[in-house]
């Protein structure tokens, strides 16, 4: 009898917490999302699920069809040493998922290619946003990685104060997300959206 209960509980937990690479596809996107308000100005990533290098992302339109182009700079220690990637929008998978194809164009860098999908879960446009980002590497190991990003318009040295942490936890719980995304030490990252 104890074995049946343990197997049942394990099965329920397995369904409740999907494996990596599936979180963003299962999350409910913001229904009244306005891309023109979101893809404008600067955003700072104050938290993401896994520790890693600081990433600077700059978005601008390519001028021909009004689709944003994402410039990604990945580096350590405040961008003292970084690589640049250009990511062009490839279209939307549906009404809520914005997709980009990225490649390094720098001389001397490895030919790293990856695809990025953004799903905006919640946004106030002037203050904060919750975004689920899926990165799929199309070269090399072809790994897939999902992360929930907490974005703010203002860069602060205080990572997330207790008041905001409580608010973010409430937002995560409403969307049935695991609090595992909030268990790591936060890094400051910048997203800059500009229209040409």
From Swiss-Prot:
Task: Give the principal location in a single coarse category.
Answer: secreted
Glycan-modified residues: 62, 187
Does this UniProt record's set of keywords contain Signal?
yes
Keyword set, alphabetical order? Blood coagulation cascade inhibiting toxin, Glycoprotein, Hemostasis impairing toxin, Secreted, Signal, Toxin
Distribution of this protein across tissues and organs: Salivary gland.
InterPro entries, per database record: Calycin, Triabi/Procalin
Q: Which GO terms describe its molecular function?
A: toxin activity
GO annotation, cellular component aspect: extracellular region
- List localization entries: Secreted
User: What does the similarity note say?
Assistant: Belongs to the calycin superfamily. Triabin family.
Q: What does the UniProt record say this protein does?
A: Inhibits the intrinsic blood coagulation pathway by blocking the activation of host coagulation factor XII (F12) but not the enzymatic activity of activated F12.
What is the designated name of this protein? Dimiconin
